Amino acid sequence: MLALMDADGNIAWSGEYDEWGNQLNEENPHHLHQPYRLPGQQYDKESGLYYNRNRYYDPLQGRYITQDPIGLEGGWSLYAYPLNPVNGIDPLGLSPADVALIRRKDQLNHQRAWDILSDTYEDMKRLNLGGTDQFFHCMAFCRVSKLNDAGVSRSAKGLGYEKEIRDYGLNLFGMYGRKVKLSHSEMIEDNKKDLAVNDHGLTCPSTTDCSDRCSDYINPEHKKTIKALQDAGYLK
């Protein structure tokens, strides 16, 4: 699914596509011209094809109509788009991004960030303490910052954005949080708050402990919650 948002955060255009870029439906109340399809592609109305900088792509066939200009360097098939377009992209019409752009270092950064964030999230679910969502957001990203690795921090920030997009989508079906569907403006505000907390944790000074950095997100009157977090090693 793709969407365009205006300066106020309102969805001005949205479209749903299958794995190969075929448009399934479109919501365009303002009659906007929006030609973008899969990453790097622009819809050509006259031909019905997608322009990919170096060649044209046919979404009905799921392949390019001309051979790869870089030959076999782009893969064994001279006409193929990434064999798994869910995980691979080809923004220039040359070779899949997982071959051309993503290096082993980036994959390791992503995995390290994912491990820290997911471990902290699992602790949050296990402890099941009310009113601690933002605290755990802060702690997860603060833990990433302590690696002092810009690449891992960048990956973590991207994962944080992906989670908020996922949460927004879940809310559309009443499956987010307490299963009470929020309005668009309420959900945008919720997303903004979470992202701000993520940044607060991620920018923790090297001389500051994560428990000190994030303790303000815990109500000081909630003594049992504080005790549980201390026992779990999250607070001093």
Swiss-Prot record:
Pfam assignment, any one: RHS
InterPro entries: RHS, Rhs_assc_core, T6SS_VgrG/RHS
Spans traversing the lipid bilayer: none
Protein family according to the UniProt entry: Belongs to the RHS family.
Protein's name according to its UniProt entry: Putative uncharacterized protein YlbH
